[in-house]
Amino acid sequence: MRPVTVIIPTTATPAREAVLHRAVNSVLAQREVEPTILVAANGAVDAGVIHRLACRPVRIVCCPVPGLSAAIAHAVGMVDTEFFAELDDDDELLPDALALRLDRFAPDVDVVVTAFIRSVGGVHEVIRVGPAVQGDPLRAMTQEAWLAAGSGLYRTNAIDAHYFRAMPAGLEWTYLGYCLALHHSIHFLDVPTLLYHADTPGSLSKLPAHVFQQPAALGQVLALPLPGPILRLVRRKYAAALHQASELEYKAGHGRAAWDWHLRSLMTRYWWRYFAYTRWLLPRSVD
């Protein structure tokens, strides 16, 4: 049996308890591996949830710093196996997911990334990591995020905690994907090994705050040593994120905030895309 660690970050609240146990079950059901489950708890942790979880074959670590990135980084520092994975507390590993990933590790591979199934409202869509991603992962990332929480397996001595600590809120796995494509050897396996529940109630990506996190997160991506053509594509996404934040603030009745975001979009290289919005916003932006 091959040892592997799976990190499950969670706030361990009663609202997440059922899906958290579902995630744990999906790891314990893995064949041909010996999984160690590290549950990294932080935030509004519920003592009852933790007590019931402690009755299962998991190791619970408490992170004093709030936030997803901090919880994962804290747990990565405790990994003592050659390989580790991360799994969000509302997602599931598919059967034989870990064995399939381990089978693809050659000595020169730092990360194995697989396809995954995205589930929204009971409708499943396979997110592929086929030839387009394999041929140019940086460009592919500007079109669709090919790395999801839970779709990768990492070599511990190559991918350390600082990668996860640096992940910006709202764009964690996209940012990590860029970093991996820039600096590490990735093996892509175009076989789904993860069921990603994109519509779990309370998920941060479904909250309006997620929109307002995008500009800062994309700004962090822009600080990476991206090739010129990729840099231009990310700059375009950055400008679009500023505009989206402006629109959302306006719809919420926050005219001054809408103007602040809009003015920032006009300071980008793609200002001309949003200039006409100025005349529309002007008579409607009084708080």
Tell where the protein language model's regions lie, with residue ranges.
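Short, acidic, metal-binding catalytic loop of nucleotide-sugar glycosyltransferases
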Residues: 25-34
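Glycine-rich, basic loop-to-helix element that forms the pyrophosphate-binding segment
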Residues: 63-79
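Short aromatic/hydrophobic "clamp" motif used to bind/position activated sugar donors
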Residues: 84
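Catalytic core of nucleotide-sugar-dependent glycosyltransferases
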Residues: 141, 192, 196-199, 205-232, ...
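Flexible acidic/His/Gly-enriched loops in nucleotide-sugar-dependent glycosyltransferase catalytic domains
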Residues: 55-58, 65-70, 98-159
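Short beta-strand/loop segment that forms part of the nucleotide-sugar
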Residues: 34-44, 61-64
